[in-house]
């Protein structure tokens, strides 16, 4: 059996709060089940909170943003792994700013996608070897904000660069009366079957 390299990306900014992070807890639970099924796989953890070079794209750095070597570092990492597990809470109807900065670094023409040789003008993803699992959390019920679906956004983004995206795991409704009093471990119990099934199939 081939050893798979798995990159686990966390993007929550609330890990250090007393309440903790639901999305990071979801990632940890998913990986707990994944490790049981795949004990020899190599796990690489990337917490975006610790990456000081993931600064926002602005007029101050636009001219050098894609040529300063930072994008290549993260793109090369993606090229070196077989699977990616990425987690994010919903923040203001989107994924986190940390994750936005990361995506700005890896979405680079002719490195992760290309329009060259495209017959109909559509993009060709350059990372078809990747298998991606998206794990998200949100306070609102699924589909509540029709204009802000961070899960679908992430699915489309990774499909755009050629990755095979597994069915996402979404812990939704966490701010509704049914779940709002629960801490992360209790909420995870309610979604446990979905998480376990996804991990076993990834």
UniProtKB/Swiss-Prot annotation:
Keywords: Flavoprotein, FMN, NAD, Oxidoreductase. One of its GO terms (molecular function) is oxidoreductase activity, acting on NAD(P)H as acceptor. It comes from the Bacteria. Its cofactor is FMN. Its EC number is 1.6.5.-, 1.7.1.17. FMN binds at residues 12, 21-23. Binds 1 FMN per subunit. Gene3D superfamilies: 3.40.50.360. It catalyses: 2 a quinone + NADH + H(+) = 2 a 1,4-benzosemiquinone + NAD(+); N,N-dimethyl-1,4-phenylenediamine + anthranilate + 2 NAD(+) = 2-(4-dimethylaminophenyl)diazenylbenzoate + 2 NADH + 2 H(+). It holds the Pfam family Flavodoxin_2. InterPro entries: Flavodoxin_fold, Flavoprotein-like_sf, FMN-dep_NADH:Q_OxRdtase_AzoR1, NADH:quinone_OxRdtase_FMN_depd. The keyword NAD applies. Homodimer. Belongs to the azoreductase type 1 family. PANTHER family: FMN-DEPENDENT NADH-AZOREDUCTASE 1 (PTHR43741), FMN-DEPENDENT NADH:QUINONE OXIDOREDUCTASE (PTHR43741:SF4). Quinone reductase that provides resistance to thiol-specific stress caused by electrophilic quinones. Also exhibits azoreductase activity. Catalyzes the reductive cleavage of the azo bond in aromatic azo compounds to the corresponding amines. This is FMN-dependent NADH:quinone oxidoreductase. The gene is azoR.
